[in-house]
Regions:
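Extracytoplasmic gate region of multi-pass secondary transporters
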Residues: 52-53, 231-273, 279-283
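Helix-breaking motifs and short loop linkers at transmembrane-helix boundaries and internal kinks
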Residues: 64, 96, 117-122, 151, ...
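Conserved MFS/SLC helix-loop-helix module at the cytosolic interface between two early adjacent transmembrane helices
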Residues: 83-122
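Structural signature of the two symmetry-related core transmembrane helices
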Residues: 100-113, 297-312
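Cytoplasmic helix-loop-helix junction between adjacent transmembrane helices
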Residues: 127-164
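Intracellular juxtamembrane helix-capping segments at the cytosolic ends
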Residues: 137-150, 334-348
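Helix-loop-helix hairpin linking two adjacent transmembrane segments in secondary transporters
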Residues: 152-153, 159-209
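A late C-terminal transmembrane helix in Major Facilitator Superfamily
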Residues: 350-386, 392
């Protein structure tokens, strides 16, 4: 594979100061090699979470878990995505970004295998936490890798990255149920998803072996200051938190809900796949439509679509579930794409943008982690999922009500 000699890039995350790797000249991988890395790593960042949805009913039956306890299999990884948003950049500064990404991928792959071998509930939850840690650290640092390796193609490469994440989610949602039926064991149906992780590890070592060997400078790191006293920052965090809560609640419980309503595991997996596919398709659509600095109209439109889909599932869950799930996902996917730009719209410098992004991600994933837990608790309390669906409708309505107040900084002056 062709390579060219360029100075090694700096490990840059907005809002943080990173030194370059020691050494003045390191041969960077080709564009094609970078694309391979992006695709394989992105494809492995969601199956460890999404694959649990089609398997929750089997896990509950075998281990005797309550729905509240089972919800932790999705809640724990999502929670760690928020908690590890801040220490991950420090680890990258201390030990090198590419080394930490490799370590995170190894942890992710090992944890998926350990979860398949779990002999107790404690081991199941501990291995799930390790899955979440690997996803959280790799996902947090990988956008920095994309920006560093493709400074002139950031939009294109980030689009490839986001689409590959959605594709990995969709494939896991579609395939996990049939794999479970074929193998007859939920453990190895979940353990199957170590294969993308192994491919990502091999690609990472093969393509980024030079940066993995390069020594790292350890000068001081300037951490960003979070906008704790800014009302707009809290409103953005609230909007993003509502969106994450709805998304992760449905990722965890959509398949079990329809299995409980009489669908087979494969059919329920297809409904979940329509949800992940709708989310993936919304990313480029709303990204292309968003041309104005003031995105409130599109934010309201995406929130309304998400609310309409959730409302349709609550009122008539058996009426065209493939369509209603895709509708809800298209709205949450659009809100996610637009919401990611809001911290940047309200920041005047890269350092400030990093601080806003870290603040929003921390708050939104911590709240989003409560979604699967709340749905599981309401299912245990009520004996059905109907009250949980109405909770998601209420959260979607709150998200819509927040949109008029998400005016960017440039339009407030």
């Amino acid at each position: 594979m062709s390579v060219k000699s360029v100075p090694i890039e700096r490990d840059v995350t907005p809002g943080l100061t990173y030194p370059a790797l020691a050494g003045s000249d390191v041969r960077a991988p080709s564009v094609a090699a970078v694309v391979v890395c992006i695709l394989l790593v992105a494809l492995t960042l969601r199956p460890g979470i999404v694959s649990m949805g089609p398997l929750l009913t089997a896990i509950i039956d075998e281990l005797g878990l309550t729905h509240t306890q089972a919800s932790l299999l999705t809640t724990i990884p999502t929670l760690l995505m928020g908690l590890l948003a801040l220490p991950a950049p420090w680890l990258a500064h201390r030990f090198g970004r590419d080394r930490i990404i490799l370590l995170a991928l190894i942890v992710l792959g090992a944890a998926i295998i350990l979860r398949a071998l779990a002999g107790s509930i404690g081991q199941l939850f501990a291995s799930t936490a390790a899955v979440g840690a690997g996803i959280a650290v790799a996902g947090t640092l990988f956008s920095s890798y994309v920006k560093a390796r493709s400074p002139n193609r950031i939009a294109l490469f980030m689009g490839i990255y986001a689409t590959a994440i959605g594709l990995g989610s969709t494939v896991a949602a579609v395939a996990t149920g049939p794999i479970d039926q074929l193998i007859g064991d939920w453990r190895w149906a979940g353990g199957f998803w170590v294969l993308p992780a192994l491919l990502a590890i091999m690609a990472w070592v093969g393509i980024e072996h030079r940066s993995l060997r390069a020594p790292v400078s350890t000068s001081s790191t300037q951490m960003p200051r979070m906008p704790l006293r800014n009302p707009t920052a809290w409103l953005i965090a609230l909007f993003f938190a509502c969106n994450n809560l709805v998304f992760y609640a449905l990722i965890a419980w959509l398949a079990p809900m329809y299995i409980e309503r009489g669908e087979s595991a494969s059919s329920a997996g297809l409904i979940l796949a329509s949800y992940t596919l709708g989310f993936m398709l919304a990313n480029p659509v709303f990204g292309l439509l968003s041309r104005s600095d003031d995105r409130r109209l599109l934010l309201a439109a995406s929130s309304s679509i998400a609310l309409l889909g959730s409302l349709a599932m609550a009122v008539a869950p058996d009426a065209m579930p493939l369509v209603t799930a895709a509708l809800a996902a298209f709205g949450t996917g659009g809100a996610f794409t637009l919401g990611m730009t809001l911290p940047l719209d309200n920041a005047s410098t890269p350092e400030e943008a990093g601080a806003w992004t870290a603040f929003v991600m921390l708050q939104s994933y911590l709240v989003g982690a409560a979604g699967p837990l709340l749905v599981g608790y309401l299912r245990d309390s009520a004996g059905h999922f109907q009250s949980a669906l109405w909770l998601l409708v209420a959260v979607g309505a709150l998200m819509l009500l927040v949109t008029p107040f998400l005016q960017p900084y440039c339009c407030r002056r």
